[in-house]
Amino acid sequence: MNIFEHSIKNVDKGNVVAIVGTQWGDEGKGKIIDILSKYSDITCRFNGGGNAGHTICVGNKKHALHLLPCGVLYENNINILGNCMVIHLKTLMKEINNLGNNILDRIYISEKAHILFDIHQEIDAIQETRKSKDGNAIGTTKKGIGPCYSTKASRIGIRMGSLRNFENFKKLYIKLIDNLMDLYNIKDYNKEEELNEFYTYHKILKDKIINIISYINKSIDSKKYILIEGANAAMLDIDLGTYPFVTSSSTTLGGIFSGLGIHHKKLNLVVGVVKSYLTRVGSGPFLTEQCNEIGEYLTKKGFEYGTTTNRPRRCGWLDLPMLFYVKYINCIDIINLTKLDVLSGLKEIYVCVDYKNKTTGELLERGSYPLEDEQLREYEPVYEKFEGWDEDITNCIEFDELPENAKKYVLTIESYIKTPIVWVGVGPTRDNTITRKFD
């Protein structure tokens, strides 16, 4: 389905579609982004850094992307790394080199994106070690994301635009690194070696660093199709997620406008990606977590191991109150439900439909969400039970081919969140996706 032509048929707006994760990440955004990239002219990433990861399965080959947008897999697609990203250039160049085929010709990097240095990763590990001693570790990927955003917020960070003039970059670099070494008592850091690496990056990338705001808006005005891919997910948003167990950037709809510099009226469709069950990496509250054989089953069958860290993900039942809250804050228009096939073989499936206060027995108002850890501990999940199914659904290509219990599961989710589920993922590849009609 060409979602761009479908979505703008009766809407006098821009040709812009956004994909956002609705949970704690790892929902399977990469696959739907990959599918839709076929129809887009430009694919944009607006936030985050190498802590995110998309795994794209094309035939028997897997592509793990941490910084590059998924559009790089299509030769007709321009790919943009946005303003609010933090970019570890060693990681970026590794991804570019792994893909080959003149990928660099189709990549542009915002001059406003911040550079993530190796010292940011060292600081991340130092901070996490200190927190773990007090039992307050966040469970970060140790990719340096938080420290890089910290230097950005402190206005001492270095932006990609500075790399175009290497002599000026060198002065900024020495000042920043000396500052951070002193602040964190880092005695041994090879500045000369890193500067040599960055001189290479300067020569390779200086013409790829541009004003993306102008580029994207001119593209929208000329009726190009723009696909926006979110990294991480809504419940990891620095402001709207389960703080402090969040990432360091805005992962929700609002982050798009600063991350790419486009007007909100230019955005005409928001796709929310929902996994059929729930997972989380690292620390933080998780009301529906299953620390039992069900959790182990979901981890193994769903191959729930982090793209970035390879850590096993915590697994549990789908949480609809959370999903309803995320729909509110992202203005989600349609849903892509993923990994329904993982639930095949379970005799019973549970879905959280309400949060009940442990003391008063009152149910949480739909659309609100207690984001603080201590607030969440006041509630317990209220479940609805569904009968499972044994059939292998990976070869289903139409919704009506699904077992009745699987269809009931999907339709119940759709009814609860009052948002059409357009795509249903029934396996790992592009072809394992059921497309339903929507108005």
Curated annotation (Swiss-Prot):
Binding annotation for Mg(2+): D26, G53
Pathway(s) annotated for this protein in UniProt: Purine metabolism; AMP biosynthesis via de novo pathway; AMP from IMP: step 1/2
Stretches of the chain forming a coiled coil according to its record: none
Cofactor requirement: Mg(2+)
Transcription regulation among keywords: no
Chain sites annotated for binding IMP: D26, E27, G28, K29, N51, A52, G53, H54, T141, R155, N232, T247, R311
Gene3D superfamilies: Adenylosuccinate Synthetase, subunit A, domain 1 (3.40.440.10), Adenylosuccinate Synthetase, subunit A, domain 2 (1.10.300.10), Adenylosuccinate Synthetase, subunit A, domain 3 (3.90.170.10)
Catalytic residue list: D26, H54
The keyword Signal appears for this protein: no
GO cellular component, one term: cytoplasm
GO MF term list: adenylosuccinate synthase activity; GTP binding; magnesium ion binding
GO annotation terms (biological process): 'de novo' AMP biosynthetic process; IMP metabolic process
Amino-acid positions noted as binding GTP in the UniProt annotation, renumbered to this chain: 25-31, 53-55, 62, 307, 313, 339-341, 425-427
Compartments where located: Cytoplasm
Entry's family note: Belongs to the adenylosuccinate synthetase family.
Subunit details: Homodimer.
PANTHER family: ADENYLOSUCCINATE SYNTHETASE
Other noteworthy facts: Parasitic protozoa lack the de novo purine biosynthesis pathway and rely exclusively on the salvage pathway for their purine nucleotide requirements.
Function: Plays an important role in the salvage pathway for purine nucleotide biosynthesis. Catalyzes the first committed step in the biosynthesis of AMP from IMP.
Name the record gives this protein: Adenylosuccinate synthetase
Protein source organism: Plasmodium yoelii yoelii
